[in-house]
Regions:
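Walker A (P-loop) ATP-phosphate-binding motif of ABC ATPase nucleotide-binding domains
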Residues: 5
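The conserved Walker
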Residues: 12
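Post-Walker A alpha-helix
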Residues: 19-20
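Phosphate-binding/switch loop-helix module in NTP-utilizing enzymes
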Residues: 76-106
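Phosphate/Mg2+-binding loops and adjacent switch elements
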Residues: 98-125
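Conserved lysine of the Walker
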Residues: 16
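Hydrophobic anchor at the beta1->P-loop junction of P-loop NTPases
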Residues: 8
């Protein structure tokens, strides 16, 4: 099955995340299974110093899986490798009804499969 994708792109503080949030709320309330992908233009951490998973990464692990009875996550350290293209990330997602992608406006993903919402605001003068 081909993934259905909605892409949300625009300038910083233009309402992208708010739009994604409202789309996800509306669609999940209708019973759809939604996944999201957020492109970050900066480094980020989902674990913190002192946590076991942080210590595993600091020790040199390329991937660290953190698993509990309510969620799980895999943290992948690039360690100098190139950032993966959107398609690579999409292939790692579990099956769902729709993927909402925030960002990746410069990525060469298959835009024929994507409905793009472009969110723009006027620059303040």
């Amino acid at each position: 099955m081909t993934q259905k994708i909605i892409g949300v792109a625009g300038f910083k503080n233009s309402g992208k995340t708010t739009l994604v949030e409202k789309l996800v709320i509306a669609l999940t309330q209708q019973g759809y299974r939604i996944s999201t992908v957020k492109h970050a233009h900066h480094a980020f951490d989902i674990d913190h110093e002192g946590r076991d998973s942080f210590r595993h990464r600091r020790a040199g692990a390329t991937e660290v899986a953190v698993v509990s009875n309510s969620r799980w996550a895999i943290i992948h350290e690039l360690r100098g490798d190139a950032e993966p293209p959107l398609q690579t990330i999409l292939e790692k997602l579990a099956p769902c009804d729709l993927v909402v992608v925030e960002g990746y406006k410069r990525d060469a993903h298959d835009k024929k499969r994507t409905i793009n919402f472009i969110v723009l605001v006027e620059k303040k003068r």
